[in-house]
From Swiss-Prot:
Designated name of the protein: Cytochrome b
SUPFAM superfamilies, per database record: a domain/subunit of cytochrome bc1 complex (Ubiquinol-cytochrome c reductase), Transmembrane di-heme cytochromes
The keyword Heme is assigned to this record: yes
Superkingdom to which the source organism belongs: Eukaryota
Residues holding heme b b566: H97, H196
Lineage of the organism: Eukaryota, Metazoa, Chordata, Craniata, Vertebrata
Mode of membrane association: Multi-pass membrane protein
Length: 381
């Protein structure tokens, strides 16, 4: 009998990607996050589709349509809670996935890494426009503050901001187009994910040792399907715990009030997963400088492969680089905390120091550590 999964044109692609895929035998739980991100994307698209069936993208009815979903639609409260907290889980997995890539030198697969950075930017754009849709106070003011940053661009800034708004401020036209963007972007993300996987399967997965694993590979199924299922169970446990019991833990209380252009909240801040970049933006007193620093904080990921100086790929056997990596992690947590604090001392100076440390660590200290570790490994020692 012909094995259909190995001969059918469509099944063959799935088979080579998820079933008979040769995978390194030593990849750890840090390699689970790719599949978890795929699951998160599916959850977000499904819950988002059901929310879009009941949501209206009009400034007069957007807020009440979200209230209607939570009160009158069957399990609408659950769908909304899963979607809102699913975004947090998505970003948690994303940050861990990127961190794994930096720690184990996965960025040396340059095509996969670059598509991954584009994916990160696209997911951030999707989350931003999605945050505006409930049309609460923080939704409105967050959209106003962030889109207004475009006006810092010389010559074309003001025109560009008004073009994005569809008027002279954030209003009905802005909400309608943001809903359109929020609906289409996840499908663009799905296409990019396929390209990401395509490039990954050209080279095969990296592994914790950073050594070529071709001599010791095992089939993806059943070994890693079982392993990924454990990760999925933990993800669902956390997501459902948030959605059922702590649904408003990661949200902003200001979003319980409808958007009011005449009343500014005392402290405008985005969702927690943007706070590190927001802190970097605020740490520079100049508007254009802040916007450039904000962009640089994400786009710096693109030059990480160029800053790799070590002879070893992974940080597994490089204690100095490991130490700097965990300092960078602590630094990002500090930036996230600062982004949620009011603009006053001592938070201003802490934010400025943490922002400076962020760029210093990635661009100077980590490449120098790689060179020093090479020197320490030379035979005369």
């Amino acid at each position: 009998m012909i094995n259909l999964r190995k001969t059918h044109p469509l099944m063959k692609i799935i088979n080579h990607s998820f079933i008979d895929l040769p995978a390194p035998s030593n990849i750890s739980a840090w390699w689970n996050f790719g599949s978890l991100l795929g699951i998160c994307l599916m959850i977000q698209i499904l819950t988002g589709l059901f929310l879009a069936m009941h949501y209206t993208s009009d400034t007069l009815t957007a807020f009440s349509s979200v209230a209607h979903i939570c009160r009158d639609v069957n399990y609408g409260w659950l769908i909304r809670n899963l979607h809102a907290n699913g975004a947090s889980m998505f970003f948690m997995c994303l940050f861990l996935h990127v961190g794994r890539g930096i720690y184990y030198g996965s960025y040396l697969y340059k095509e996969t890494w670059n598509i991954g950075v584009i994916l990160l930017l696209t997911v951030m754009a999707t989350a931003f426009v999605g945050y505006v849709l409930p049309w609460g106070q923080m939704s409105f003011w967050g959209a106003t503050v962030i889109t207004n940053l475009l006006s810092a661009i010389p010559y074309i800034g003001t025109t560009l901001a008004e073009w994005i708004w569809g008027g002279f401020s954030v209003d009905k036209a802005t909400l309608t187009r943001f809903f359109a963007f929020h609906f289409i972007l996840p499908f663009i993300i799905t296409a990019l994910v396929i390209v990401h996987l395509l490039f990954l399967h050209e080279t095969g997965s990296n592994n914790p040792s950073g050594i070529n694993p071709d001599s010791d590979k095992i089939p993806f199924h059943p070994y890693y399907t079982i392993k990924d299922t454990l990760g999925l169970m933990i993800l669902l446990l956390v997501l459902l715990s948030l959605a059922y019991s702590l649904s408003d833990l990661l949200g902003d209380p200001d979003n319980f009030s409808p958007a009011n252009p005449l009343s500014t909240p005392p402290h405008i801040k985005p969702e927690w997963y943007f706070l590190f970049a927001y802190a970097i933006l605020r740490s520079i007193p100049n508007k254009l400088g802040g916007v450039l620093a904000l962009l640089a904080s994400i786009l710096i990921l693109l030059i990480i492969p160029l800053l790799h100086t070590a002879n070893q790929r992974s940080m597994m056997f490089r204690p100095i680089s490991q130490t700097l990596f965990w300092i960078l992690t602590a630094n990002l947590i500090t930036l996230t905390w600062i982004g949620g604090q009011p603009v006053e001392q001592p938070f201003i100076i802490i934010g400025q120091l943490a922002s400076m440390s962020y760029f210093l660590l990635i661009m100077v200290l980590m490449p120098l550590a790689g060179l020093f570790e090479n020197y320490m490994l030379e035979p005369e020692w």
